[in-house]
Swiss-Prot record:
It comes from Drosophila pseudoobscura pseudoobscura. Post-meiotically transcribed gene that has a role in late spermiogenesis; required for actin cone progression during spermatid individualization. The gene is soti. GO terms for biological process: sperm individualization. The keyword Lipid metabolism does not apply. This is Male-specific protein scotti. Glycans are attached at residue 83. Residues 12-57 are annotated as: Disordered. Residues 16-26 have a biased composition (Polar residues). The keyword Glycoprotein applies.
Length: 133
């Protein structure tokens, strides 16, 4: 066999003899060296310096997002039941489109058209203080 082939094939020494030219041993030593950034951590003192205020170095975390509620579980606001009939409520909605100076006339016309015995037989649906037809 050619002696140059022996130079190409490098077998590990397995600790036999002190062969400093063994690349496997050199690679192992390189791996055993500590990380270069680890030096400043190992050289650091065990306790922080006492002359500095620790509150100055606290990092405030950003506010956590609020929990989003499902519309199925949120309660709806309670509507107070007033003594207003459907007729008055509908009339109030109808006069919102009228100009402010003509709302009174528009309200009277609306009530005249809609407050009849066909819509409210025997006054059913109207406030009791209005009486019966």
């Amino acid at each position: 066999m050619d002696p140059r082939m022996y130079r190409l094939i490098r077998l590990p020494s397995y600790g036999l003899g002190n062969n400093n030219n063994d690349p496997n041993q050199q690679r192992g030593e390189r791996q055993r060296q500590p990380h270069p950034d680890l030096g400043w951590i190992l050289d650091a003192p065990n306790e922080p310096p006492r002359n500095r205020n620790p509150l100055l170095y606290l990092v405030t975390a950003p506010p956590r997002p609020r929990k989003k509620r499902s519309f199925m579980t949120t309660s709806k606001p309670f509507r107070i039941q007033t003594n207003v009939s459907d007729l008055q409520y509908n009339a109030w909605q109808a006069i919102q489109d009228a100009p402010p100076e003509k709302r009174c006339e528009y309200y009277v016309k609306y009530m005249d058209e809609h407050m009849n015995s066909q819509n409210y037989p025997n006054g059913m649906g109207l406030p009791h203080r209005w009486g019966q037809f």
